[in-house]
């Protein structure tokens, strides 16, 4: 089983934000080649970030949970997410009202674009 490992240091975020990016109405995904090793080889380096302007903590956490659940579903599909990359997913306020079923194909399409 693949576990999600979060980025911890600011230099990790800065490096990941400089490379590839994809924007949608519900989230933005930033990706860069793995520049440091995850704790375990099977882990995926990914962080979920929300702006404080989105709303209170309940709203931000709900968006984070939706996006994280979609990533978990995509990890079960073979080859949907490349584990050789470090990802940062910025949630947007539109994702709060949107159903998870709508977000999943968008996220899958975004991750496939980042592979190219």
Predicted regions and their residues:
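Positively charged, solvent-exposed patches that mediate nucleic-acid binding
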Residues: 1-116
